[in-house]
Regions:
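Alpha/beta-hydrolase fold active-site loops
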Residues: 56-57, 88, 135, 145
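Positively charged n-region of N-terminal signal peptides that target proteins for export
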Residues: 1-4
Length: 186
């Protein structure tokens, strides 16, 4: 019985640590180069971050099994809507092994419509970016450099997030001005 309880507790602790549910702020510094990231669109065609050069990118790493990710998705969708028609892309990169049908079912359930959805079934992006929990969202400038990172849930439909994206849009050549602070929260 004790072994069973220890196994159960260990499994729960592991699962809790795999999704970053705590609210945390982020401070950004000078933009830094991103590692090469390759991923698949929903049709299975490979692409990478170079396809989005010239655009501000909000890159959200998530998984279908991550409850905080599910909670955050609608705000990301509203962020995408707020910048529709501007050179801003909100990319939702699923880093679990779920097939495209399950990823799409998850998105349908959450009710998102404006996110550019991609898959990384081998979770290579999490290793390349040294991600330790989900969700994680990167702000990427027009030159393809990481200009900010939020670990955990953020209010992507709030003024602080809008201001960060507007600042990246206004920066000459996509940077290198630092963004300051983005408060995260649900």
């Amino acid at each position: 019985m004790r072994t069973l309880l220890l196994l159960l507790f260990g499994s729960l602790a592991l699962a809790a640590g795999s999704c970053a549910a705590a609210e945390a702020p982020i401070a950004t510094a000078e933009p830094k180069p991103l590692p090469e990231l390759r991923f698949l669109d929903m049709a299975g065609v490979e692409t990478g971050m170079e396809a989005f050069r010239g655009e501000v990118v909000v890159l959200n790493l998530w998984a279908t099994w991550c409850a905080p990710c599910k909670e955050e998705m609608p705000a990301l969708d509203r962020l995408a809507a707020a910048f529709e028609g501007r050179p801003v892309r909100v990319l939702a990169l699923s880093v679990d092994r779920a097939p495209p049908e399950r990823v799409q079912a998850f998105l349908d359930e959450v009710g998102v419509e404006r996110l550019a959805v991609y898959r990384d079934p081998k979770a290579a992006a999490t290793r390349a970016l040294k991600v330790q929990g989900l969700p994680v969202t990167l702000l990427v400038d027009r030159e393809g450099r990481e200009a900010g990172r939020v670990v955990g849930i953020a209010r992507w439909d709030g003024e602080e997030a809008f201001a960060a994206v507007r600042e990246l849009l206004a920066a000459p050549g996509g940077g290198p001005r630092p963004l300051g602070m983005i408060q995260t929260g649900s």
